Amino acid sequence: MEEYKALLDEKMDRVLLSLDSEYKSLRTGRISSALFDKVLVDYYGEKTPLTRVANISIPEARLIVIQPWDKSLLSKIEQAILSSDLSMNPSSDGSVLRIKVPVLTVERRKEIVKQAKKIAEEYKVAARNVRQELNNKAKKQEKDSQITEDDLRRILDDIQRDTNSYIKKIDEIFDLKTKEIMEF
């Protein structure tokens, strides 16, 4: 039974880490270079994360400066940002891109909250898939007479209780993210 608990914790922790990573790429009231983690630049025919081809700095509260390591990528980086869902317009001075980040409108914040909710639901599904995988493993062990029916019932109950706990954590993370997004 401890084997199931350890396996569940390991897989659910990965789900929570992935959710956290996904949420870092959502724009909130605070500016972060993590916003650009999912922006892919065409780098010699390969789609490469922006963070691997440029230095991203935030010298002021509402200003982002992107300095490519290879100046020939400047226009490709600009295109990648324009085609992303970040709603940002970079301006180039020939060597760096500057992005003045406007304050988010209430409507845009609500859109981002909807996006965060959708992401949270996807991760709840992932958590339920982990539960289903472990339930099937336990049922197979019972079918193969490796564990008793009582053990199976206990294992399934433990898996369900722990899954509910992880889904509650996903909801708490979503609530915190919503609060962060809606801050002015």
Swiss-Prot record:
| Predominant location | cytoplasm
Q: Where in the cell is it found?
A: Cytoplasm
- Which molecular-function annotations from GO does this UniProt entry contain? ribosomal large subunit binding
GO CC terms: cytoplasm
| SUPFAM superfamilies to which the protein is assigned, alphabetical | Ribosome recycling factor, RRF
Q: Is Calcium among this UniProt entry's keywords? A: no
Question: Does this UniProt record's set of keywords contain Heme?
Answer: no
**Family label:** Belongs to the RRF family.
What does this protein do, in the record's words? Responsible for the release of ribosomes from messenger RNA at the termination of protein biosynthesis. May increase the efficiency of translation by recycling ribosomes from one round of translation to another.
**Record-given protein name:** Ribosome-recycling factor
Gene giving rise to this polypeptide: frr
